[in-house]
């Protein structure tokens, strides 16, 4: 098989590093209106405030959790069996789907009968694929437009709120100053949301199931949940919700095995990946994808043209609509939740890329551009777009309309080719919505900071507020090896301006296929960017975690500082490099300033002085300055004293 020949289905096992709970964290479930709506969250426990700081209780903080059952010690994890079919009952009870007697795609049947791949295949699936009954539409958008609040929508509303109201209520009972503490910890700076309706002075204080339904019906948000991926935990992508992060994984012709890609998926979701795209281009794409989907609690996206190209031995000009259609059905019946489809690469735009510094950098875009030139006609993706919609709504696969002409350098940013394609994607969005097919739009790419908002504004206008999903953008081209940072800058900005999901970039971008460590670095960097965007927009409750960590920092609760952070392991590692002893975990200083120059310790000294003198903090500062002034004059009023 791939470069690593060791993977066999019988020996498959979970990555042990991905199943241990994070420090001082436990998985909790919030039940909805019915017992089978159990929404997972991560509860981070905190130590009490030391008596010297007031001695109050610090209740647990709840955070969004994408890790699925993997971080639940009560769950039995066996990747050979896959995850439980969480949504199966919801799908079946709607009565608009049917279980097929077998696979519909020619390629799927061919692979199932191939004895050469039998030892690689996932053997744990004991159900056949489902499809909409003839004449039915099973998309979440279709239900939303009919006024139906699905269990998925209720699940999402609970998940987005992160038990914020319960946390603030628990603060009120934490001690005699509970009401004051709740007001302080719940305080949040007003955001600038650039027109996003959920935020601002008249915005929401919490997300409701009805609001979720309205946003999906409007096309401003999508719920990527294929009916053949019932293992997935419902989530939402839209500018009026928490900014999400996607992680790209996948093998290539020269590296990685099925086992490694499953490990990358479990590692990505441990650190906060909201969706995962399998971009495999090497051998056994079908089998790799099956293992990933069956073991993924988050939506899985793909670029179907990659696999279609493999079926014609890499010759783009030999691609046909029939081959591509069969590939869509094959992947839809496996359970892929969203497809990147480069239907906006039109023949008329291809010559516009000749003036670029870096030409066409999208793999999918270059494949379709080559096909258009070879046949001198519009691509079969564009010509058959409504046929594709018919497939999508039969399985509830969402469109991720690909930016095949995205700029690959800041030199090419916002050029005619890029913006022409974006306008076409807006036109295709209207066609998809006519079929009630959920749709998001992919965006750049490499864009300098001053041009980022123009990208967002044009997308909102031309694509009628369909969710934007961007790769970065990278804000400079001078830092190979650090493109998670060059792109994280742009990601935070465009997330603030309205992008709904950010596609991570790892340190290996432009250099090689990322390993597990690179995946973690990319995810953490992009969770940081997404959270910064949520804060800037004024997402209700976004600042709760910041406030909790800042309070822990001021009270020298080191363990709580580590555990409330995005990467507790890294924070603890850095601290322990210079102060490894357990006693340092309760010290009132760190190695940066030492015991005598810690600004927070000095502030505490001022407060203690104020309490002793019976004055306010401001009065204490003034009084302390007067004492020092007298002392200074007595020593001769010299700035530098001889010792």
Curated annotation (Swiss-Prot):
Keywords assigned: 4Fe-4S, Iron, Iron-sulfur, Lyase, Metal-binding, S-adenosyl-L-methionine, Thiamine biosynthesis, Zinc
UniProt entry tagged with the keyword Metal-binding: yes
Signal peptide range in chain numbering: none
Leading EC class: lyase
Cofactor: [4Fe-4S] cluster
Catalysed reaction, written as an equation: 5-amino-1-(5-phospho-beta-D-ribosyl)imidazole + S-adenosyl-L-methionine = 4-amino-2-methyl-5-(phosphooxymethyl)pyrimidine + CO + 5'-deoxyadenosine + formate + L-methionine + 3 H(+)
Cofactor binding remark: Binds 1 [4Fe-4S] cluster per subunit. The cluster is coordinated with 3 cysteines and an exchangeable S-adenosyl-L-methionine.
Residues annotated for Zn(2+) binding in this entry: 446, 510
Listed EC numbers: 4.1.99.17
Bridged cysteine pairs (disulfide): none
UniProt: substrate binding residues: 248, 277, 306, 342, 362-364, 403-406, 442, 469
GO process terms (BP): thiamine biosynthetic process; thiamine diphosphate biosynthetic process
Pfam families documented for this protein: ThiC-associated, ThiC_Rad_SAM
MF terms (GO), sorted A to Z: 4 iron, 4 sulfur cluster binding; carbon-carbon lyase activity; zinc ion binding
GO cellular component terms, A-Z: cytosol
Keyword check for Lyase: yes
Gene3D superfamilies attached to this UniProt entry: 6.10.250.620, Radical SAM ThiC family, central domain
Binding residues for [4Fe-4S] cluster: 590, 593, 598
Pathway participation: Cofactor biosynthesis; thiamine diphosphate biosynthesis
Complex formation: Homodimer.
Primary role: Catalyzes the synthesis of the hydroxymethylpyrimidine phosphate (HMP-P) moiety of thiamine from aminoimidazole ribotide (AIR) in a radical S-adenosyl-L-methionine (SAM)-dependent reaction.
HAMAP family membership: ThiC
Similarity comment: family membership: Belongs to the ThiC family.
PANTHER family: PHOSPHOMETHYLPYRIMIDINE SYNTHASE, CHLOROPLASTIC (PTHR30557:SF1), THIAMINE BIOSYNTHESIS PROTEIN THIC (PTHR30557)
Protein name, entry field: Phosphomethylpyrimidine synthase
Origin species: Paraburkholderia xenovorans (strain LB400)
Source species taxonomy: Bacteria, Pseudomonadati, Pseudomonadota, Betaproteobacteria, Burkholderiales
